[in-house]
């Protein structure tokens, strides 16, 4: 089993033309809407549960994924949604306001953790807050979560998602984006990077031995 992470540039001034055309076409064809929030409490109330339910629905077919329990979902909604910069969170809904796609990203905390040697005290908390909320951020962002409802996969919904997010990344001064580990054989997620300059710079292998 092979999983890899990819880094992509997001500094270009314009979204690729083909990418933009696909996103506009998909939005009209399926009557999709982009939803943005400015309140963590509001997004948690409206879509907190649905975000992680969609994650379970989209990821369950993938090798090694264990669906989140209701207790875990409740904890993530309470702990993580309030600390996100909601400019970097995009929801896509259908005509009935049902969630069909979500993208969640945040500034990379790697540099902050390096400065504090992985410790929260005495100053580790400051570096983390600086990375998350202050104007001078890291140049790298982490693509934490992209989930698409199964019946909308392979239809270009990802293009609509990133057409909304990329201008935000540029405005905030990010240069690179890094994905979470992706299965090499997951063609759906690999295909979404076809329109970007990417570099695979990490690789993980899992070896399985049958025990008799």
List the model feature ranges, each with a label.
Residues 9-26, 197, 204-212:
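C-terminal "cap" of GNAT-fold acetyltransferases
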Residues 37-147:
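A conserved beta-strand-loop-helix scaffold within acyl/acetyltransferase catalytic domains
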Residues 140, 144-148, 153-167:
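Conserved acetyl-CoA-binding loop-helix of GNAT-fold acetyltransferases
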Residues 148-153, 179-189:
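Conserved beta-strand-loop-alpha-helix junction that forms the acyl-donor binding cleft
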Residues 18-45:
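Conserved N-terminal entry element of GNAT/NAT acetyltransferase domains
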Residues 140-141, 169-182:
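Conserved GNAT acetyl-CoA-binding A-motif
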Residues 4-5, 192-203:
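Conserved acetyl-CoA-binding loop of GNAT-fold acetyltransferases
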Residues 1-7, 11:
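Single conserved hydrophobic/aromatic residue that forms the stacking wall/gate
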């Amino acid at each position: 089993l092979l999983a890899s992470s990819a880094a992509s540039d997001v500094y270009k001034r314009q979204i690729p033309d083909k990418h933009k055309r696909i996103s506009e076409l998909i939005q009209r064809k399926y009557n999709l809407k982009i939803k943005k929030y400015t309140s963590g409490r509001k997004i948690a109330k409206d879509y907190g549960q649905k975000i992680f339910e969609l994650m379970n629905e989209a990821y369950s077919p993938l090798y090694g994924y264990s669906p989140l329990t209701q207790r875990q979902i409740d904890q993530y909604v309470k702990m993580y949604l309030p600390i996100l910069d909601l400019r970097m969170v995009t929801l896509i809904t259908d005509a009935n306001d049902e969630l069909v796609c979500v993208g969640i990203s945040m500034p990379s905390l790697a540099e902050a953790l390096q400065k504090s040697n992985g410790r929260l005290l005495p100053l580790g908390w400051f570096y983390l807050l600086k990375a998350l909320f202050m104007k001078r951020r890291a140049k790298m962002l982490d693509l934490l979560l992209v989930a698409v409802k199964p019946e909308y996969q392979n239809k270009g919904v990802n293009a609509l998602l990133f057409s909304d997010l990329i201008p935000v990344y540029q405005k905030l001064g990010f240069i690179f984006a890094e994905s979470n580990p992706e299965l090499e054989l997951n063609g759906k997620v690999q295909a979404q990077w076809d329109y970007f300059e990417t570099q695979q710079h990490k690789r993980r292998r899992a070896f399985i031995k049958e025990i008799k």
